[in-house]
């Protein structure tokens, strides 16, 4: 049966069946493209109709003193500006990390010991560097992945369906100008059409009875409604531009780097490089190179620790007769800086569970501190607007891209750095207090245990790098699972077992009064031997009774 299935070629639909399916897919693709560009056609047609009606009102004779040629020229100018801004916002690339070469090769599968310089101030939900798995590229600060455009966008604000594209770093200025010009255009149309209706229609009864200008009334209604809604949306985006924020940053919580991360990374970086200030300084380059080679081999071994059980790690069920040798600390690196494979091989389940609880508590503290931090990229309203509109005031009202920056490097605000430094000092003080508490608790427990070890016991030592592992016994053998530890124990006593001892000690002072004579003792011993022989004969036949 399997041979028949293996030899039979895969069936495929014939050409008459595949042709309608391909035609349907092509039609679906065309319909989706037409639906994508429908908002563009709608905006262009609606604004063209509005400017035609508004200019016609100004060119006709009117009783209103301010409706005339100036209002028509103003409407045409706003129409040109808003459509130019709209076109630039639609057809300008908002910017993507994929279009630039920066950071494309920052990730590698090879083990490295050097730590990268963290220039980013935001992290992912897990606290690590932000990386897009769909685009296969690192995400800088303020960059997000758009599921509609199917790519990452630099300084992404939102995906606008009326633009059929994302609003990002390079087209946000044109988008904001489009909102401003459209709001002004709607209010101008509403004012001109409403004034003309009030002065020409309601004051002339015969004219009202004979004809009703439908276009003017419709322009007044649409101009008022769209202008009211769009003005609020424009004011919202102007406030975001003044504060230096995006829509995503305002509506969603931004996760910043932990205040202790840079300090811990710098401390670990010094240890990895072998910064021996008090030790041998003869050949620091050779020593550091040797340490790096040793770290490379150790990382490769840890990555394949589960590939060869029994060689690179202890096999499951294997029991060691002697305690596991302790691994010497490499360049002062604590257990918290070991890889998960190293921690699984050198630490027990209780210690790992304590470490997980500690990590969860640290994540909770990071979330609490994250809510206390101000916006990291708010440089003040003046610098925020200069970043958006550029340094040339003559180009501020023209829809050309004058936004500064490349989308990869962002300058943090002074308030954010001060708040982060204050939180870092507070966290360091809390960690020092916690280490002091564990140090005292460890010393008290060891001093209480020295009475059992004797007067020659060594004094207890404390390792400040492991506050949560202070109760670990370094001489404890490695834990393992074997058939001996998994042997079932019956709650019923075995044959020959008893809760009381069978033999009676003659030297026991509590039983000296009840000890019989020598003859009686000999008879009692013979009876016990006979009972043991009987029990041994029944043991083979009753062994299954020990199992539940």
From Swiss-Prot:
Residues 54-70, 195-215 are extracellular. The keyword Transmembrane applies. The chain crosses the membrane at residues 33-53, 71-91, 174-194, 216-236. It is an enzyme of class 2 (transferase). Pfam families: DHHC (PF01529). Autopalmitoylated. It catalyses: L-cysteinyl-[protein] + hexadecanoyl-CoA = S-hexadecanoyl-L-cysteinyl-[protein] + CoA. It comes from the Eukaryota. Its EC number is 2.3.1.225. Residues 536-548 have a biased composition (Basic and acidic residues). Its main location: membrane. GO terms for biological process: protein targeting to membrane. It is a multi-pass membrane protein. Residues 508-535 have a biased composition (Polar residues). InterPro entries: Palmitoyltrfase_DHHC, PFA4/ZDH16/20/ERF2-like. Residues 1-32, 92-173, 237-548 are cytoplasmic. One of its GO terms (cellular component) is endoplasmic reticulum. GO terms for molecular function: protein-cysteine S-palmitoyltransferase activity. Keywords: Acyltransferase, Lipoprotein, Membrane, Palmitate, Transferase, Transmembrane, Transmembrane helix, Vacuole. Residues 313-339, 463-548 are annotated as: Disordered. The keyword Transferase applies. It is found in: Vacuole membrane. Belongs to the DHHC palmitoyltransferase family. PFA3 subfamily. PANTHER family: PALMITOYLTRANSFERASE ZDHHC16 (PTHR12246). The DHHC domain is required for palmitoyltransferase activity. This is Palmitoyltransferase pfa3.
